[in-house]
Amino acid sequence: MVTTNVVTGKVVVVSGPAVDCEFPEGQIPPVHTAIRIISEGFDIPTPIDIICEVQQHIGEGRVRTIALQPTEGLVRGMQAISLGHPVEVPVGPETLGRVLNVIGEPVDEMGPVNAKKHYPIHRPAPSFEDQSTRLEMFETGIKVIDLIEPYLRGGKIGLFGGAGVGKTVIIQELINNLAMKHGGVSVFAGVGERTREGNDLWLEFQESGVIDPHDYTKSKCALIYGQMTEPPGARLRVGLTGLTVAEYFRDEEHQDVLLFIDNIFRFTQAGSEVSALLGRMPSAVGYQPNLATEMGELQERITSTKNGSITSVQAIYVPADDYTDPAPATAFAHLDATTNLSRDIAALGIYPAVDPLASTSRILDPHIVGEDHYATAQMVKGTLQRYKDLQDIIAILGIDELSDEDKLTVARARKVQKFLSQPFHVAEQFTGFKGKYVKLADSIKGFREIVEGKHDGVPEQAFYMQGTIEDVLEKAEAMKKA
């Protein structure tokens, strides 16, 4: 029974992030209700004021909650106040340029977020009649993505890769390109990743002008963090907080929003920890039995409506590079495009280290992207696939044993491979190359000319870390003079 009055109970069991609270019978708060626990009347060095979320009703007036903030210093008998609604977070333009935590509190020491509206983090997905079925490509300015696995506006994109192959750098470049070229709003949800990365991202965005913490009208991105040091409850719910902030811009301001989740695997990992704390029987590989349901509740809210869209780019860590692991495999089912990052390509020094043969897109279709784009992408993939097939022969017999036609294919494939590299704006200080945004038409033109043999006389090295084909020809001229 839900009452409108404030219901007060007390803490009866504390076992790490799982906290059991007792309430009067008949006034038990429903599942997903926010519970505030305070240390008023207790003589402890640091006062406690934390938020938990109801997960289970365990009988005799008791509920099991999961803490969204650290539980150090929590003592049995402390006051537990039911807030009567789920966790609510500030939404609106006032969140831009700010760093918020899972419960919407600012963690950037820039004062309170004076938002006019608050939304609950648990909300239903848009209904069938509200959803849009329009298929339209979203230009990113990154050659390999735009040509081989074009992103769908309002779609879900997975960035797959093991540790350290460049998922976060691609996300940073996408935010930069969206803000600089499209003037759009982004929401970045840092789910269980390194605190240092979160801090670096915030500082980089200030330097590049993506955000101004002192003036939200000049900011293009809201940052929502639940980092590795946070309790599992925070890491499980911070994705929903980020999504709720993005939903405001889609539904109320009718914008096309980019939602970045780094890393969706940590969301699953946190769910597994919470599941164990709640005493559920583990499923395959020790994951939670409700893995697909949890993932669905998050993913189904990320969609296009007739008012606006949320295009989501999700970094997906692949444990031990095993794509059959239940966590990445469950995420696969929801995606419209996949950008697959390969350690082998990174080892060649080609960045972004995207594997063009393993990456896919639902909209790489001549009816959606056009005949020219589709044909060029297939020619590029065909050339790279032939090169891959010939690599065993080259390794055993050497390149001289190939036919003239195959030698030409290999030469063009190596140029294509080098041309797939691209200098990023956000990596300028590491690479020394000036960042380049490449329009789709320039990408198609450049790759088509390479596979058709127009640049067979240009040295391979001239194609490395360049933007357009004109940049390549300029580099080749400079190499000749040197």
UniProtKB/Swiss-Prot annotation:
Q: How does it sit in the membrane?
A: Peripheral membrane protein
EC numbers listed for it are 7.1.2.2
Q: Does the keyword Magnesium apply?
A: no
Binding-site residues, ATP: 161-168
Matching entries from PANTHER family are given as: ATP SYNTHASE, ATP SYNTHASE SUBUNIT BETA, MITOCHONDRIAL
Subunit description: F-type ATPases have 2 components, CF(1) - the catalytic core - and CF(0) - the membrane proton channel. CF(1) has five subunits: alpha(3), beta(3), gamma(1), delta(1), epsilon(1). CF(0) has three main subunits: a(1), b(2) and c(9-12). The alpha and beta chains form an alternating ring which encloses part of the gamma chain. CF(1) is attached to CF(0) by a central stalk formed by the gamma and epsilon chains, while a peripheral stalk is formed by the delta and b chains.
Q: What is the role of the protein in this entry?
A: Produces ATP from ADP in the presence of a proton gradient across the membrane. The catalytic sites are hosted primarily by the beta subunits.
Its name, as the record gives it, is ATP synthase subunit beta
